[in-house]
Amino acid sequence: MSAGEPGFETFIRSAQKPFQALPFLSSGAASAIDCGDRGIAISCASHSGSTTHAREAFKLLWQSDLDVGLLQCPVPPGSESALQYNCSGKHAAFLATSRKMSWPLETYLQADHPLQQEVNRRIAELLGLPPDELVASR
């Protein structure tokens, strides 16, 4: 049974952040740094860039012995740091996972990076699709 247009391609954007955090959890990166509920929450969230949010994203990096300069998210207009970007927690978790898995840090956002391949594999598996059918993987 289906409703609507099941073949319609769509971008889920921030709704995929919890799925993008799966490698952070399953790799042992989250438990290795004992990030707690707040760390997991910021890794799955879009946030407002408040000091509290930026601090949680920084904590993920600090506990993973990573430098803020590795973040590949922009500095929001009127802000001082990429930590204030609404996706900084996701980026910090990506870096923590890459560090834990000994994957390259500088290229963590590239489609051919092992982390991005793992994220796509996990999302495709949950959707019951081959990874190459994901729009993001094209």
Question: Which residues make up each language-model segment?
Answer:
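Active-site-adjacent helix/loop patches that line small-molecule binding or acyl-intermediate pockets
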Residues: 35-138
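Active-site SXXK
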Residues: 12-29
